[in-house]
Amino acid sequence: MVSRLRGFLAWVYRWITTTDHKDIGLLYLVTSIAFLLIAGSLALLFRVQLAIPKSNFLTGDAYYEAVTVHGLIMLLWFASPFAFGLANYIVPLQIGARDLAFPRLNALSYWLYLLSGLVLLASFFTESGAPNVGWTLYAPLTARIYTPGIGLDLAALAIFLFSLSVTLGTINFLVTIAAMRAPGIGWFKMPMFTWSILFTVILMLWAFPPLMVGGALLLLDRNLGTEFFLNPAGGALLWDHLFWFFGHPEVYILLFPALGAMADVISTFSGKPIYAKRYILTAFLIATIISFVVWMHHMFITGTNIYTRLFYSITTILISIPFEMAVMSFIFTLYKGRLVYTVPMLFAVGALLNFIIGGSTGVYLGSIAIDRGFRGTYWVVAHFHYILVGTVTLGLIAGLYYWWPKITGRTYSERLGKIHFALAMLGVALTFLPQFALMDMPRRYFTYDIPEWVPLNQLSTLGAFIFGGSMAIGLVNFLYSLVKGGSAAPNPWNSWTLEWFTNSPPPKHNFDGVPVVRKDNTVVFVSEEALSKYGKDAIVEGRVDVSNVPLSGGQSHSSHGLTHHGTTDPLVLAAGLTLALFGLFVSKPLSYLGAIVFLLSLARWLWKDVKNVFAEELPGYVEHWPFPKDKIRSAMWVFIASEVATFGSIFSAYFFIRFNPVGKFLTEAWPPGYLVHDVNVGLINTIILFTGTMLFTLAYLGVKRDNYLITLSGLLGTLFMAIYFLTVKYFEWKELLIAGLGLDAGMYMQAYYVTTGAHALHVILGVLATTYLLVKLFNGNLRGRQALSEVLAVGIYWGIVEIVWTLVFPLYYLV
């Protein structure tokens, strides 16, 4: 009994300390499926409610709670995390990497994802219940006067934590794909699934910051008395802009991984490379760009300028063209192919058919006139569910069936899989096709008494239960596979992408030797010694015969650092942060406890970095063009890109509020900054910040020349200037508050405090980073190429902090 308990505890400890990308991928998959079961159960509840007119199965509040949480989970906590479960496991294998660039950040991203979802679900157990304002969280319904209690606060907090998780994951995947590809894997030799994840994380990089900013402003409105979404100067339209600038790219964030998985599946089981791959990748790139200029088609009926509506109508129709190209590519790949109708192939083709239906019905909504008629009806519900359920969910299930033998080393029942597919397709059709005919039924009614709607709603409810049953069959199939499934061969599908060139499941180090993809597309495995001896280019070009060169397997994967990658730090850090923020709404002592845990865990994390416990440099043979072979600097540039979106959202809100004619007419005038603030104080802080940045340049030169005194002087000078800046800012705020210019002094002061507060928070993070470098210097570890990368990364960070201030100063102190 004791030995079993010890074994169980060891098993639990392994999973809570793992940083291996394959383990993290499995955690994402299992957790996202659990969230799917919750969201699906909520959907069945409100479908039962709608099956009968004047039903009392659910109260109005219960119905709206179910719809709201269902939508949020499906949008945020199921589809993307499921895709990233597959991506965590498969992408490093497809590009020949040992792991993601930052294994601990990968684990931290997962734990933040899990805990954010639990925070959302915790809202059900509050006195006010879960949020019931709809998954779009439209203002002004979200104001405390209309939605009291902490349920909505917890939902906003959950979204904030989830967005933080996404940011960390985005950095990790972009750096991994850009700078850790095995020799010979150029950009166009990457499989479609890896390409789709690359486009996805690029979208995430700029789509999630507006949501995070919007969520933060919502929490301020509800808890500190600001009026960003209540005052007519901001109001519902400001929320619409922030939410939908995230919301429409989110559609493609969900769609791209499914299309990538479908492409790999269709290519494999057609026996042909994907048709016109380079053109499709170009189309996906164009779609990625256009996706950021279509969000206002969700706002056609808000009274925006007719020419603005016309522009967004055109972009909405234009963005369909890249996806039409993808559909044609898949069809031409299938045409005259050696088709093998396996379970993953059936799901991929079924998802393709659903995509045609969902996509074509969405194009109608690009018309301003048609959108006016369909907006807020079940036509829209049917359209986006054909995309999100019929295409995204089934496409990702195709990927799961496809890679299941690789992930588990087990086979599954083809018969159960085909039953799963048939019922899923039937369920999608019965659930959502009737809803196109319900184009005159408002989508947010919890009951109705119109007889003509009854048969269609009952068909839809029947379809929902059939679809739910199909998912249960799929789950049984996977569980059966784990218990009774036969052993899977390393490459059961005779595929040609790199993940199939290792065992099923892969070993901890992924590959025995370093995979090299030669110019003729053959794959060889060599040791790191051979790469160093013969050179990467010679092996890739086939000028060297490596068939008899030993792999030296133990050495070739030692750089993965498996012996010391296990750590509880990501879990404890995520738990501390979540507890600290959760406690603000539930219990202040809980918040204090969480803050202590967070700070201690962060200190422990950074101390290990000071001691270079996890320090790893990229091997010299990786493909990284055109990016630097420096993952720390690359990660900082990616983070800076997300910061551009974050502060871009804040400044966009500033301009929207300041120049909104409705706000000017109904509210107080926006005063010139020089009448409110002392320009000299702003100028002094500008000089302080610029001086600190120049001193940091001195520190960089000191590390580069290995000069301790110059480095110390530069870092201490930067730290002093940053603290001086914060001190000046503190006394400036204090004087404003004494003068009665607090958050209750109007939108101008609210915008000022939010903008300068966000900037000050970034200065504090800079202080933390500079202190870390100082501690590392005192410990004698701030030297060499790794240290130079860290110093340069922190210098880049100080640069963006300085640039933001050059915008804050004139906007709030001069004009």
Curated annotation (Swiss-Prot):
Q: Which GO terms describe its molecular function?
A: cytochrome-c oxidase activity; heme binding; metal ion binding
Enzyme Commission number? 1.9.3.-
GO annotation, cellular component aspect: plasma membrane
Please name the top-level EC class of this enzyme: oxidoreductase
Q: Where is this region: COX3?
A: 545-815
Q: What highest taxon heads this organism's lineage?
A: Archaea
Q: Which GO terms describe its biological process?
A: aerobic respiration; electron transport coupled proton transport; respiratory electron transport chain
Classify the protein's membrane topology as the record does. Multi-pass membrane protein
Q: Which UniProt keywords apply?
A: Cell membrane, Copper, Electron transport, Heme, Iron, Membrane, Metal-binding, Oxidoreductase, Respiratory chain, Transmembrane, Transmembrane helix, Transport
| Name assigned to this protein | Heme-copper oxidase subunit I+III
Species of the source: Aeropyrum pernix (strain ATCC 700893 / DSM 11879 / JCM 9820 / NBRC 100138 / K1)
Which gene is annotated as encoding this protein in its UniProt record? aoxB
